[in-house]
Structures are given as C-alpha cells and as structure tokens.
C-alpha cells in the first residue's frame, strides 16, 4: 500500500508529468539536456521513477505483488513511463554493458501490456499523451 500512496501523491504526478514532457532529438541531445553531469536534478527525478517502477516489477516477479492489482493502481504510469524511456534504458544497457539494468521495470511494463490486452484494452501509449500532436501528424 505504501507504493500506491507514494504513486498517488500530487508530487508523483508532478514528477511523472515532468518526465513525460522531456524531449530530445537523439541520444547525444538527450545526454546534453538530461545527463547526470549536466542536469543532476533531471537525473535524480528520472532515477527516482525508474527505480521505483523497477522495484514494483521485481516484487511482482517474486510473487509478492499481484499483477492485476498493480495494473489497477498504477498500470497507466508504468505503461507511459516505459513507452517514454524504453529506448534510453536499452541504450544505457548496451552502451555501458549492463544487460540486466532495470529489468524489473521492463518486466512490469510487459506484464501491464499483457494485462491490458487480457482486459480487451489497447496497451499502446499515444505519442500525444503529454504533448499536442496535430491530427495530420498522427495525433488524436
């Protein structure tokens, strides 16, 4: 329940929104804007979210949390954060040779996709979720 309380706080939503609205053109641009040396605040914000969701995934994997309850409580957060950060996390794994980096986060994201689909919902997160994308460019 402590995880839910933290992830339902106003501060969580401020942090989640800030993370989801970060933009970059490529990995160099990302690192220039948000890398730990250049922007320690963004680094701390990102790691706080990533490691929390990684922990949720590890708890589910160890059968200490129930997948459907996690989905009901924070499934949207998991899906949107993974959609935003997947490529960066995979790049970090490859660039720094740490293949298991945040595997709990990836695990729980995959489980949230399965749970969405089992309920008959789409699991895709639209690119326009946290920024305006005109309809002619694929927005809603």
Question: Language model features by range: what are they?
Answer:
Residues 1-140:
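Amphipathic alpha-helical "stem/stalk" segments
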């Amino acid at each position: 329940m402590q995880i839910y309380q933290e992830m339902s706080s106003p501060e969580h939503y401020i942090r989640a929104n800030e993370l989801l609205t970060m933009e970059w053109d490529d990995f160099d641009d990302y690192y220039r804007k948000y890398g730990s040396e250049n922007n320690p605040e963004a680094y701390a914000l990102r790691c706080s979210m990533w490691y929390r969701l990684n922990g949720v995934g590890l708890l589910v994997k160890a059968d200490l949390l129930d997948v459907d309850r996690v989905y009901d409580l924070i499934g949207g957060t998991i899906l949107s954060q993974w959609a935003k950060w997947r490529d960066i996390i995979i790049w970090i794994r490859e660039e720094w040779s740490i293949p298991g980096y945040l595997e709990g986060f990836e695990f729980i994201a995959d489980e949230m996709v399965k749970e969405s689909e089992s309920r008959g919902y789409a699991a895709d997160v639209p690119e326009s979720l946290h920024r305006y994308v005109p309809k002619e460019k694929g927005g809603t």
